[in-house]
Amino acid sequence: MPVLFLFIFCYLFIYISFTFGYPMKTGFSCPPKKIWHNLLHSAKMCDIIIKLTKNIDKLRYDMIEIKVNGKIKKVPVGTRVIDVLEGYDKKRDIVCQVGAQVKEINYALSEKHDGMEIKPLGLSHSEASKAYETTLRFLIAMAFRNVYPNVKIRFSYNASRSVYCEALNKTFNMSRAVEPIKNEVKRLIDADLKIERLSLPVEELSNLYAKSNMKDKLDVLSYRPEKSAHTYKCGDYYNYLHSYMVASTGCISDYSITPYSPGIIIQYPRHELNAEIPEFVEESTYGRTLQQAYKWAKKTKLQTIPEVNRKIERDNLLEFIQMCEARHNAMLSDLGRAIEADIENIRLIAIAGPSSSGKTTFCNRVRIELLSRGIEPVMISLDDYYFEKEVICKIQNKPREELDLEHINCLDVELFNKDLFDLINGEEVTLPKFDFTTGKRVKGRTIRVENNSPIIIEGIHALNERLTASIPKHRKFKIYIAPQAQMNIDDHSPLSTTNLRLIRRIVRDMSFRNCPAATTIDMWQSVRDGEFKWIYPHQEGADFVFNSSLSYELCVLKTRALPALKKIKYTDPQYLIANRLIKYLKYFTPITDESLIPCNSLIREFIGGSCFKV
């Protein structure tokens, strides 16, 4: 209303001035010499009115409407989410959902959030669990700064869904530090210190990190294309772990810090376990592979993104790529020797791993490795043993649209075991063939397997004992494949191998299935749910773990993934995940000359140009 009154007053003033001139002793008359002056004055006032009317919309948005717990609320622009949530519980409400986006709980609302619904998210949500874990790492890093200011630490993801922390100072005894660090973390939590997200010029932030002797942070900032960057401030401590965090230290309550020589293990509530901390299980086979990956990255100086970039910028690029491929060749050679040493007993080679691990290319390379040792394997596809959907509907007692097509009961396990048993015993078998065009199972090829020819199978259930129950354990050789890159953005921010696989899948789906990045991201949680249910419970039963990561691959994938991810709009529900992937892909120096990559490389399965049928 005040704007409207101002508009009317200004209009009347202009009208009177232009028509009658200024009040004079002789009355309201306008001498000719004043006309041009009045016109000029009126023009200026009109300009003012135009500017005012342009701002009416802006003034109207001083207040926005939001929906909280089913109620419509009017709040001023700039209001924090934490201030509008009814019954806010800092230990329960970790992050929030604003419209389609997940935000921090103390996020400030703006005009673009007008009409959106807001709800808190607890630890049963994946993004809340991630923010919680990130904050826990932040607190532990802060505790080390407070108690042992000269000690440098590094975090990495570890077996049993945990985080591993080690001291980079060779002489530091981490076992003695466990109790002091636990006490300091508890003190910080009890103090309920505010955690504030800041945006600072890169130069100013670099000075802050330099004063704190955070050389790893400075290295990363040198590759940042933007002129400003985010950081988090808690008291006098600054750090950024490349993810959202909680509002204050007091939001953290449930966690575990235990010694695990030569470092410590950190555990936290997992969303897939309904906010429970998983029991720590010693996964010796898987853990050994992680340790080998860590040692190799350390020896070759490929532990962080800046180190990878320096290999590309300063060294011979072809040499770098061939070095990474040579490591895969060496692992395949180790695998071939292990199978050859027991070939008299091994009749079945079972290969499994999570999505986008490179299983198809790997199976072909295992076959060639065995051929080089005089062993002629036979490959059988588990896909050919799928039941038709009508049969699966009866088995699962569900309509077609609700079927769990990853369930083991979608496979004809009985027929598969019978065919395996007969083949291993030297009989001729006519295999089934599943026609995915018609959705029907038909007759396939007829084969007989020689005594020295192991059968290779690959699929999500390949390591499940139920699938191959007719074959004695000593006659099976199980292989688990997954990328286990022990690489960090910086010392406190390990790269998730899950995100690496998602980037691989985005690139593959675009290249071979004409599928946009948003669709792949939409499907990803369902893929992950299937992995937790059908793959991870059986990984420790593997006789061999193959690490399919290549230290240079994200430099190659970046050139394809980044443009696709940037097409996802802020208002799209996939934006949060897309933006997270963009945030660390942008730091990699791109490799654009794909001709340097061998045609049998595992990465060819995702970018194309493979010599194998993928």
Labelled PLM ranges:
Residues 349-351:
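Hydrophobic anchor at the beta1->P-loop junction of P-loop NTPases
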Residues 392-435:
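Conserved nucleotide-sensing/catalytic segment adjacent to the nucleotide-binding pocket
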Residues 343, 465, 469-614:
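Conserved NTP phosphate-binding and transfer environment spanning the P-loop NTPase/kinase superfamily
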Residues 95, 99, 110-130, 143, ...:
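Auxiliary tRNA-acceptor-end handling modules of aminoacyl-tRNA synthetases
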Residues 362, 366:
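Hydrophobic positions on the alpha1 helix immediately C-terminal to the Walker A/P-loop
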Residues 359:
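Conserved lysine of the Walker
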Residues 11, 15-22, 37-54, 58:
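Short, positively charged and aromatic/hydrophobic N-terminal segments
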Residues 372-389:
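Short beta-strand-centered segment that lines the nucleotide-binding/catalytic pocket of NTP-utilizing
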